[in-house]
Amino acid sequence: MRDMISVASGFQYSVNIGYDLGSDNKLKSFIPTKSALSLLEDILLSVNPTSSDRARVLIGAYGKGKSHIVLTILSILMKRDLTLFEKLMPKIEENPRLYQLIQNYYESENKILPVVISGSNTSLTQAFLLSLQLSLIHISEPTRRVVI
């Protein structure tokens, strides 16, 4: 059986958004689905300063890639180098509207501050404030990596 079935090299078993935010390998290994491309397009449309439709709820079974798509979209919003999205960019290039949205976003002066909220025994408000503080510390000290 092992001769017929094997795990692809580089296959990642899990994604932790806070820990993997700077991981190039996670971005390179993301395999986009039609629904992932649709979500990316929706989010790119929602970052327009005039947009009021910004909230999203992502529901799916364990292991379906929710964290991986969020990590990938967040990395695009952070304007990471597009060459890191090895498997994603060919699919995006097949969709002229999505490709143009990404090009326009990368050429814009829009900036996104990632605030990754981790579960804790504090209130949601406290968890948000702590995560916001850590994100602000991270951007003010570019040589320091803060894992939330």
Regions found by a protein language model. Name each.
Residues P96-Y99:
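Short, mixed-charge aromatic SLiMs
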